[in-house]
Swiss-Prot record:
Source domain of life: Bacteria
Function: Binds to DNA and alters its conformation. May be involved in regulation of gene expression, nucleoid organization and DNA protection.
Organism annotation: Ureaplasma urealyticum serovar 10 (strain ATCC 33699 / Western)
Molecular function in Gene Ontology: DNA binding
Signal peptide positions (record): none
Regions crossing the membrane: none
Entry's family note: Belongs to the YbaB/EbfC family.
Keyword NADP belongs to the record: no
Subunit structure as annotated in this protein's UniProt entry: Homodimer.
Identification of the protein by name: Nucleoid-associated protein UUR10_0100
Length: 99
C-alpha cells in the first residue's frame, strides 16, 4: 500500500470538499412554501429574505401567520441541508472505506 499516494488522494479529496462546501455556503436557494411564502436562504443557512403573500396576513390571526412562517423556514432549512448532503456525498468516491 502506497501511503504517500493515499495521503495525496485524501488531500485532493479534502480540497475538493472544502471548495464545494464554500461554494455551497454562498449559493442562494429559493423556496416557495405553498405559494404563501418565498424564502431565499444561503447554503450556510442564513436567511436572505422572506416574502409573504398579503392574502395570508390577517391582523386578527397572527398565530396562523407565525405557524406558516415557522413551517416555511423549517422546510427551507431541511431542504438546504439535504441538498448539501447530496453534493458532499457525490464528491466522496464510493468504496473508499473512509466514509
Amino acid at each position: 500500500m502506497d501511503f504517500q499516494k493515499l495521503a495525496q488522494e485524501l488531500k485532493k479529496m479534502q480540497n475538493t470538499l472544502s471548495k464545494k462546501q464554500k461554494e455551497f455556503e454562498e449559493k442562494v436557494f429559493d423556496f416557495d412554501y405553498k405559494g404563501y411564502v418565498l424564502i431565499k436562504i444561503k447554503g450556510n443557512l442564513t436567511i436572505e429574505s422572506i416574502e409573504v403573500k398579503t392574502e395570508i396576513v390577517d391582523p386578527e390571526d397572527k398565530e396562523t401567520l407565525q405557524d406558516i412562517l415557522r413551517a416555511a423556514v423549517n422546510e427551507a432549512i431541511s431542504k438546504t441541508c439535504k441538498e448539501r448532503d447530496a453534493i458532499m456525498n457525490s464528491t466522496i468516491p464510493k468504496g473508499t472505506g473512509f466514509f
